[in-house]
């Protein structure tokens, strides 16, 4: 099962209906805890948690660490997949993950997947997706989800 999490909506529900930026560690902690609650409340086992960042203005390093890195450490068997990622989001998330030796999946606009973070962790993540039959390698060498 793929669980969809609207990060912008979680941010608005957690803090303020007009807040669009993920900045400061306390903000990140509140948002992460809310996301963890949503994931824990799922009725069926979650294979992939798609976190949609559409509508999120910016994310700083502390929020990238507090949300993405900590969720990766505590996600269990669920694979985190980030969508709606801007170049600015990527610039904050990538060095945080690389520093922790972690990787996360990014879903590009064309539906293809790429791993972001530490190179070894990124390669292992893509291999795990294929091994678990959650994704398949395409003839062009990219990876695409097989789950709907």
Predicted features, each with a name:
Residues 140-148:
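Short, cationic-aromatic polyanion-contact patches
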Residues 108-113:
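Conserved alpha/beta core segments of nucleic-acid transaction machinery
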Residues 117-132:
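Short amphipathic alpha-helical interaction segments
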Residues 1-21:
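N-terminal presequence-like segments and adjacent domain-start helices
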Residues 130-140:
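A short, conserved structural fragment
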Residues 12, 19-48, 53-104:
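Amphipathic alpha-helical interaction surfaces in cytosolic regulatory modules
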Residues 102-103, 121-125, 145-146:
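Short glycine/proline-centered loop/turn elements that form peptide/ligand docking sites
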């Amino acid at each position: 099962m793929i669980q969809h999490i609207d990060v912008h909506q979680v941010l608005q529900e957690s803090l303020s209906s007009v807040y669009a930026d993920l900045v400061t560690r306390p903000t990140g902690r509140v948002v992460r805890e809310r996301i963890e609650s949503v994931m824990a409340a799922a009725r069926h086992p979650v294979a992939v948690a798609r976190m949609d960042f559409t509508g999120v203005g910016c994310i700083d390093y502390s929020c990238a660490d507090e949300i993405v890195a900590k969720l990766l450490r505590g996600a269990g068997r669920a694979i985190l997949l980030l969508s709606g990622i801007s170049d600015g989001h990527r610039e904050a998330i990538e060095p945080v993950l690389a520093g922790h030796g972690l990787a996360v999946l990014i879903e590009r606009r064309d539906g293809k997947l790429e791993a972001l973070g530490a190179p070894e962790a990124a390669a292992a993540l893509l291999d795990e997706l294929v091994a678990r039959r959650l994704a398949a390698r395409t003839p062009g060498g990219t990876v695409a989800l097989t789950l709907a």
